[in-house]
Every structure is written in structure tokens, then in C-alpha cells.
Amino acid sequence: MPAPRGPLRATFLALVAFGLLLQIDLSDVTNVTSSTKVPTSTSNRNSVDNATSSGPTTGINMTTTHESSVHNVRNNEIMKVLAILFYIVTGTSIFSFIAVLVAVVYSSCCKHPGRFRFADEEAVNLLDDTDDSGGSSPFGSGSRRGSQIPAGFCSSSPYQRLETRDWDEEEEASAARERMKHDPENVIYFRKDGNLDTSFVNPNYGRGSPLTIESHLSDNEEDPIRYYVSVYDELTASEMEEPSNSTSWQIPKLMKVAMQPVSLRDPEYD
């Protein structure tokens, strides 16, 4: 049956050709698929997670950087304040040290030479002629000599308290001077330079003597008499002649007062 064989052959050849074409297309598709990586669900999830996590990390880094800069600025301000305080304290300390040093040098340079030192309170005790009851003195109520003798002076002070004298009346003043001549109360006269020229009783104690010695006898009779020296400026003879009548009377200016006993030979009374 040659008639149907022709159409069948043609159909068969067409099918074979179609199959070859289909095979070629499938191989191309397979090559394309193998060369191109198609993302799977897992890779997509990882990509999304990475993208999601990268966003907040950048924000955190920016916040941390800002906080660090603010912290550094605060630290710088604190350091500036501390530096200012340090300079102030250091400057004050240096200024105080210099002031103290200048004061010490000044006091050392102005200190009078010799072994005697100023002691105003002791000078008041030495010069005070006022009794405990408030007696008067030739120096007037406003003078330092007219001040009250402290309580317990005789028992606590190393200086001998001189006899209380009342200079209100001229007769009493003359009598007091006579008593001093006969009872000089262990007051010794020296030259103004402080050297012991002649040891004798000074009858003019309190009346222009430039330097006097106060004696103090210890409670123990075996102990020698201790002497304390005090130096005064001399007054003019006219001022010392009649203290009660002198309008220009002034207390002898204290120059020096001994702070320690001095060694002297016994006074020679005439």
C-alpha cells in the first residue's frame, strides 16, 4: 500500500524534527538554569535578615559616637574648671608663703639687738604704783602707770612689788622720796649702756633712772636673790624734779625688759 506510506513517512519525519527541536530548547533552558543562581527561600531569608540587622546597627553606631563626643566635651569643661581651681590655690599658697617670709624677715631685721626682748605687760607690772584699792599715782588716772595691779601679783609675778605711794599731796610725795632713800627696796642703778659700773642703791627709782633692776627673793632662803633688768629712757631733770606739779610729766618710755634673770653681785647699800 504505497499511497498511505508517503503521508505517514512525512508525519513521522515531522515528529522527529519536532522532537529534536524540543530537545535543543530543553538543553538551552537547562544550561541557562545551571548558569543563573536562582535564590531559594533560605537565601532570601538571610538577605532580608542581613538588611534588617544592618539598619539598627548603623543607628546605634551613630548614637554611640554622639554620646562619646558629648562626654568628651563635658570632660574638657571639668578639666578646665579643675585647672582654674588649681591655679587659684597654688597662687594663694605662694602669696601667703611670700607674705609670711617677708613678715619674718622684717621682724628679724627690726628686732633690737641684745639679750633683752620687749614685754609690755611685764613693763606695766614693773612701773605700776597703784595699789589694789585703786590708789592714785603722779602719772594721773589716764596713764598706764595708774592702771590696776592684777590680782595675785605678789604671789605669781617674779618681780618684787614696790611699796605703794600716794602722790596726791606734796608732803606725801616728799615723804615717799625720803622713804626710798632709806629703804630703796633693792633697786640698783646702772649705766645706760647696761654695764654694771658701781653697784649701789638708786634713790631715784621711778624718777629718771635709765636702767633699773628688780629683785625677787625665792621662798627658799637658800636660793640667792634673782634680779630682773628693765631699761627706760631718761627724763629731764625739770620733769622729774616735782612730779606732782609737772604738767609735762610722762611715763618713762620702755626700751627693753628682761625675760630671764641676770647675774649680779649683791648690792652695796650706802
UniProtKB/Swiss-Prot annotation:
<dbReference type="Pfam" id="PF11359">
    <property type="entry name" value="gpUL132"/>
</dbReference>
<feature type="region of interest" description="Disordered">
    <location>
        <begin position="33"/>
        <end position="62"/>
    </location>
</feature>
<feature type="compositionally biased region" description="Low complexity">
    <location>
        <begin position="33"/>
        <end position="43"/>
    </location>
</feature>
<dbReference type="GO" id="GO:0005886">
    <property type="term" value="C:plasma membrane"/>
</dbReference>
<dbReference type="InterPro" id="IPR021023">
    <property type="entry name" value="UL132"/>
</dbReference>
<keyword id="KW-1133">Transmembrane helix</keyword>
<feature type="region of interest" description="Disordered">
    <location>
        <begin position="129"/>
        <end position="179"/>
    </location>
</feature>
<dbReference type="GO" id="GO:0019031">
    <property type="term" value="C:viral envelope"/>
</dbReference>
<keyword id="KW-0812">Transmembrane</keyword>
<feature type="compositionally biased region" description="Polar residues">
    <location>
        <begin position="44"/>
        <end position="62"/>
    </location>
</feature>
<keyword id="KW-0261">Viral envelope protein</keyword>
<feature type="transmembrane region" description="Helical">
    <location>
        <begin position="84"/>
        <end position="104"/>
    </location>
</feature>
<keyword id="KW-0946">Virion</keyword>
<keyword id="KW-0472">Membrane</keyword>
<protein>
    <recommendedName>
        <fullName>Envelope glycoprotein UL132</fullName>
    </recommendedName>
</protein>
<comment type="similarity">
    <text>Belongs to the HHV-5 UL132 family.</text>
</comment>
<keyword id="KW-0732">Signal</keyword>
<dbReference type="GO" id="GO:0055036">
    <property type="term" value="C:virion membrane"/>
</dbReference>
<feature type="signal peptide">
    <location>
        <begin position="1"/>
        <end position="27"/>
    </location>
</feature>
<feature type="compositionally biased region" description="Low complexity">
    <location>
        <begin position="133"/>
        <end position="147"/>
    </location>
</feature>
